[in-house]
Amino acid sequence: MGAFTEKQEALVSSSFEAFKANIPQYSVVFYTSILEKAPAAKDLFSFLSNGVDPSNPKLTGHAEKLFGLVRDSAGQLKANGTVVADAALGSIHAQKAITDPQFVVVKEALLKTIKEAVGDKWSDELSSAWEVAYDELAAAIKKAF
């Protein structure tokens, strides 16, 4: 991978702000997309036991945390060229036996959500910046298993 540029970091950061502008709505988009592709994922998230409820603070909090981690990964990539994940994140994903295909489902849902959040500002360059930041975060989480 080449160096993560300042422009890529700015694209991720600005689109994260678009996501944050309506976290309840975009949390629903995100988790609905995950459950459409992988219904069994419902069992991996305790806050999905009653479905996708935008008024559930755990649902919106988890979405904001995940998208924030990807944004932070973009910052780490720009500053250091690598992403380091907290060991606890690796431990949680290891305990739940998260697989590569599950990481892909989350990435696809994340991209769909950001695309909806930014509307006509969506571009291949924006998609690529989020993909790189997410992929590097996922790799760091797996390394911390």
Curated annotation (Swiss-Prot):
Using the UniProt record, give the first listed, main subcellular location.
cytoplasm
Which CDD domains does this UniProt record tie to the protein?
Answer: class1-2_nsHbs_Lbs
Phosphoserine carried by residues: 46
| UniProt: heme b binding residues | 46, 65, 93, 96
Q: Which UniProt keywords apply?
A: Acetylation, Cytoplasm, Heme, Iron, Metal-binding, Nitration, Nitrogen fixation, Nodulation, Nucleus, Oxygen transport, Phosphoprotein, Transport
Pfam families named in the record:
Globin
UniProt-recorded name of the protein: Leghemoglobin 4
Species this protein is from: Glycine max (Soybean)
